[in-house]
Amino acid sequence: MTSYFSLTMLGLILPGTAVAYQVIPRRARWAVLLAASYVTFWAISGKLLAFLLASTVTIWLCGLALDREIKQRGEALRAPGANRKAVKQSYARRMRLIMAAGAVVNLGMLFAFKYVVFAHRLLAPLAAPLLTHLGIGWAAPAAIAAPIGISFYTLQAVSYLVDVYRQSVTADRNLCRLALFMAFFPQIMEGPICRYGQTAQALWAGHGITWENLVSGSQRILWGAAKKLIVADRVNLLVKTVFASYESYDGGIIALAAVLYTIQLYCDFSGTMDFVVGTGRIFGVRLPENFRQPFFSRTASEFWQRWHITLGTWFRDYVFYPVSLSKPVKRLTTSARHLLGNRMGPVAASGVALLAVWLGNGLWHGAGGQYVLFGLFWFTIIWLGGFAEPIAQSIYERLGIDRSALPYRAFQHARTLVVVFCGELIFRADGGWAALGMLRRLFGQFSLASFADGTMLKLGMDGADFACVGIAIAVLFVVGLLRERAQHDPAASATPAGHAGMPAAATANTAATRFALAWWQNFNVRWVLGCALILAIVVFGAYGAGYVPVDPMYASF
């Protein structure tokens, strides 16, 4: 079982867990969720469950050690005649060591599973001559299967340790509660990357399954299944064909593959997040959203505030801010202000933290040259965008261009989409050199001839497939537009989200927004839409004869 939309998950694990959860006493419901989580993990990764357990026990022990140091520091500071500065420095040093030890253990396991082979490939040309001269043998390490979700739960583990160190949360003395936070079965494969303060208490609370949560959660799961099975899995064969032999195609086909891969990745990943959030809703747990209409973005920075949101905020809070506030970068910022001024200086200095974020982001996804290029690509786009913004603003003001006008906003959307498609092409390529080769053909040999001669219909998708995907994308656009307008309504956006992440209709200011939200949230309409989704999945889903099941794409990261 490697898919959330498999019969094993939808027909056995999820309903079985829900029934067992509801019938036993509230105080023991956490045990049902934890058992389901470990059974799911075992079904996918078998004995590698031991590494998840090791990670959990490590942060539990380190958290308790940090908690002890925090309490002892408080007692030492309250002691008569205490040298407060010396006490703070002493305990801060010890607490940093404890936090670092826990982080190193967890990141070390991640490195061992994901990056040893890549590191060997990079270092071998440099180290091999020296080792040969010294008579030391160095065998190439073999690639090994990693525990499912290790990239996700490792970041959760590190965030817990840092938050305890910062005293944002109190160390949990209950190992089982911490284990459930680390392993909750809907999010174990693909996230979202949660903070302890967001979900731990809700998972432990054992809220009963209500009819409203069951219906809204199930409909969210259906919506995710439709995105994955109707769109993502349908375009998979064309994407695989073109990326595997890009030398055989002109720039037009490569552009088509890049666009379809971006759509595939979004529908697969956001569809999986719909399952995860919907399942959490059934059990009364509000998991953080990972997507917020990313293709409505007008800049590259905005795109990454809407795409894989929990990963972006993790790197912001645990990499960007610490690096930016470090003493060397502060000194660099001061020097940059003197050289470049108060506007450009901080932008230039922020490049250090931004580079750390984007190299980390790229390598978090995988060990390969394409992931390094992916990170460098987005670093360059966003960093240079920071330099260009004040210059562009000055030019537009002199030319009298209204940046809030529809034509300019449309230009921004189109420009951002082109950047996104290029970035995802790099991301999907089979290696760094392949990414560069595809970009070279995309821009150097662009042609629409393959669309006219029928080549595009011989790559795994026929006319009916393209029509099906086109209609599905149109539906996604309309739903996204509805959500976008709802979230930009000042009154509606100020209220808690209702069904499917939308605010209550009664809070909207405009008549159009009120009508759209009321229609969306009408009970009968939701049931009709739910039945329509089931019918659409049955009729148009890419499964059965002629289709190869596609594992969740982000599960491999």
Across the structure, where does each feature detected by a protein language model lie?
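Membrane-embedded transmembrane alpha-helical bundles that form the catalytic cores
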Residues: 1-556
